[in-house]
Amino acid sequence: MKSVWRTLAIALLASLLLACADQRRHTRAVYLLVDTSGTYAIELEKGQHVINYLLGTLNPGDSFAVARVKSRSFSEKDIIAKVTFSKDPLQANQQKKQFKDKTLALKQQVKGGSAYTDITGGLLQAAEFLNETGAGRKTILIFSDMQEELDKQTMRNVPMNMTGIRVVAINVTKLHTDNIDPRR
């Protein structure tokens, strides 16, 4: 009889301890949008430094994607590399090396820049990727001059659900046109 009570007490204590455990997800997901348009293509080397830094800070189980902002209609083909790192640290390090190798080719792929810059389309794609990962902390980094250039056919008045996603613009450069009309 004592052993039954002892077993019940241990089971009750174990269930109470499990109920008090931290239920948050601690994985991170980062989506980096790199502007490769004509006005910003010269900054790509700095973008590679950002990628290298992020690879050093991400942990096993985290997710990372890098996409170029170049076309007027952002799509899956603009994603250069994406990965969810393995829980095994050795395998995660190997995945980081492969990821870095994929992104090193970015500078060679960009020749002269593009005529259009669909930042809003990139944000929509990034939010979709981040929400699919199920990560606890989601961040979109925009490496751009923030000059969105769309043709008259491209419509971007769609609602964006960015709930739970941090959006940070980095290395934003001042353009000559900013002095002409600062509201842009």
Identify the function of each model-found stretch.
Residues 16-19:
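C-terminal motif of bacterial Sec signal peptides marking the signal peptidase cleavage site
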Residues 147-184:
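VWA/integrin I-like adhesion module and closely mimicked acidic/polar interface patches used
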Residues 1-9:
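Bacterial N-terminal signal peptides that target proteins for export
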Residues 47-53, 125, 150-156:
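N-terminal post-signal-peptidase region of extra-cytosolic proteins
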Residues 21-23:
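Bacterial signal peptide processing site
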Residues 26-137, 139-143, 172-175:
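Von Willebrand factor
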Residues 35-43, 105-116, 178-183:
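Second-shell loop/turn segments in exported
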